Design a protein with these regions (language model features):
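Conserved donor NDP-sugar-binding/catalytic core segment of glycosyltransferases
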Residues: 53-85
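Acidic donor-binding segment of Leloir-type glycosyltransferases
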Residues: 1-18
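Non-catalytic, C-terminal membrane-associated alpha-helical segments of glycosyltransferases
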Residues: 145, 151-152, 159-206
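Conserved nucleotide-sugar donor-binding catalytic segment
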Residues: 34, 92-172
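Short aromatic/hydrophobic "clamp" motif used to bind/position activated sugar donors
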Residues: 41
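Glycine-rich, basic loop-to-helix element that forms the pyrophosphate-binding segment
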Residues: 18-36, 57
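Short alpha-helix within the catalytic core of nucleotide-sugar-dependent glycosyltransferases
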Residues: 1, 30, 38, 51-63
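The conserved acidic donor/metal-binding loop of glycosyltransferases
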Residues: 45-49
Length: 206
């Protein structure tokens, strides 16, 4: 909150909305989308951070390319003795459609930007891996997401984000692919295996 207030004092177009209690990530993101009056929507998890020009550069890309969904490359990092340890940057493909995404969840939530009017009534469902479900539903509308061409997102790896939850994530990936992506039994097996493999390839076991 202190960091947000610093930015609010510098920019009069920033609004901060307080919740009386923690209602979860999905509720907060859906509320932000509903209250937003901007042309584009971006999300930044509290563990992650952006380079200073991330939003400006990405908006310029969206305006020039006329894309409704974009993302950036990103660099994973973790904390060791309060020091940031950076891993190899994840270079995301130039273009990603729905079929590609469900086999490799390579779009970091904190890296993406979506045209608000395109989101429409799509919401983050109140499930584990709500960001995977949301991005799947956006891409299923028929758009092709595009790489904005810069590495401006830094994604923090925590114990909760990877290995300690791998079995839970497999379960919810299976559930989302069945309910939202309407994949066949074999399609769900393929998706879960490829997502698991690509996650290990990008982040390792840390």
């Amino acid at each position: 909150i202190e960091i947000l207030n610093v930015f609010k004092h510098k920019h009069n177009n920033i609004n901060i909305f307080y919740l009386s209690k923690n209602k979860g990530v999905a509720f907060s993101r859906n509320l932000g989308i509903r209250l937003s009056k901007s042309k584009y929507i971006s999300f930044l998890d509290s563990d992650d951070y952006w380079s200073p020009n991330k939003l400006k550069d990405q908006i310029n890309f969206m305006e020039k390319s006329k894309k409704v969904f974009s993302y950036t490359d990103y660099t994973p990092f973790f904390l060791k003795n309060d020091k940031k340890i950076y891993k190899k940057s994840v270079i995301v493909p130039d273009l990603i459609n729905h079929d590609q995404f469900i086999n490799d969840t390579c779009i970091a939530t904190s890296s993406m930007m979506i045209k608000r009017s395109f989101i429409g009534k799509i919401k983050f469902p109140k499930v584990i891996l709500e960001d995977y479900a949301f991005k799947s539903k956006i891409l299923k509308k028929g758009c092709i997401a595009a790489n904005a061409g810069n590495n401006s997102t830094f994604y923090r790896i925590t114990k909760d984000s990877l290995s300690s939850n791998k079995f839970r994530n497999i379960y919810w990936s299976w559930h989302i692919n069945k309910k939202y992506n309407k994949l066949s039994f074999l399609g769900r097996i393929k998706s879960v295996l490829l997502i698991s493999f690509n996650s290990l390839r990008k982040y390792g076991f840390k």
